[in-house]
């Protein structure tokens, strides 16, 4: 019986969506490697991060099948993360950029899976769709703790808050091995698909036989759902053919193209091209006037001005009410604070103000105090930005996603529970100046050493009252055989003790104690 050879048939598609100006997603699909990265950081930073990580993984597609798949994936991911760190060092303006990553390395009947962030991997097997990755997000922690249901997480306002990503800082991705079977279909997707499209609708699209048509349909569904974010998908079938595809597919930022679908280049045009045609209500154009319009009277002009003033005032009041009901966590004067309003300014006026400040007790118990409050709990100190680990510090500096006051307090508690640096150790106690250190064992057991504090040396010759040159230590007088000569005072040499490790640096690997 001939041995069954399993290979991949795959398709990849990417679209910048209907809201974003550029595509920060990058995707690679090849005979052995399927990889998807969703960049973040704004402007060009996100697409730079996703390109660096995909470039670091691409060589795995050329390797011979076999060996330790997870070790290969782990090494490639660390190389990509190091590339991000090096890029940030060369261009400090890119600080805070990062990317998610979900990738599969295929080798016959087994595959390795690496995951970090909120992109997703799905498996369709025997008609059942299963999510094979776990979101590294704030709302997923709420689901794990039983505070919200998975259905509530799907529409939670903080669902985009990522807790782990590749940002150039040390991080451990999730690595798993899986069995591959003929007939399996795998889907890798960015949150541009999983946020606006339900799992049930994704399942329907994945049941389309051809992988290219299935991928195209998934992009359409995301755009019909509003296309709020870049959307990228990889659809791959495990088949038992003698040969599979060999030409790799690049899409998204790494390919230099924002879109792969042949859609109009405007958001409205692309939206109308994929949406169902709606009935157009025809309007009869007004007939042209056959007489000259009279000039507006002063009373009518005054009425219009008054109406515009009322509308503008109402708009300002409504806008002010909306702004005052919005809260987010950000850095204010070096402290992790809950801000009220929205980020930015209008006509030189700030649209936000500090509302609550985080306060930590020596046992890391979090409380909130009002901004400007003269006193809080006696044993608490303000939660500083430098108390956080570097990845969360960068997110807070940029401002976490806004929502209600309860949402912001929940984010603050999550930071205090999981994102603080360890406390710096207390400084070692030292002897007060002027007080001699306690004698060593060798000094206390020397029988004939004088204990006078005025004597600089324990030897008799060094304390001779005459003004002659002190005797050489090796030529001690034979009259005192019970006291062997000592060439120097008996002290412990600093070179004999091991050097202590460098102390932890506050704000880098520890936080200052309260």
From Swiss-Prot:
Residues 1-302 are cytoplasmic. SUPFAM superfamilies: PP2C-like. It is a single-pass membrane protein. Residues 324-514 are extracellular. Residues 420-514 are annotated as: Disordered. Gene3D superfamilies: PPM-type phosphatase domain. It is found in: Cell membrane. Its EC number is 3.1.3.16. One of its GO terms (molecular function) is protein serine/threonine phosphatase activity. Mn(2+) 2 binds at residues 38, 191, 229. It holds the Pfam family PP2C_2. Residues 9-238 form the PPM-type phosphatase domain. The chain crosses the membrane at residues 303-323. Its cofactor is Mn(2+). It catalyses: O-phospho-L-seryl-[protein] + H2O = L-seryl-[protein] + phosphate; O-phospho-L-threonyl-[protein] + H2O = L-threonyl-[protein] + phosphate. Mn(2+) 3 binds at residues 118, 160, 191. This is Serine/threonine protein phosphatase PstP. It comes from Mycobacterium tuberculosis (strain CDC 1551 / Oshkosh).
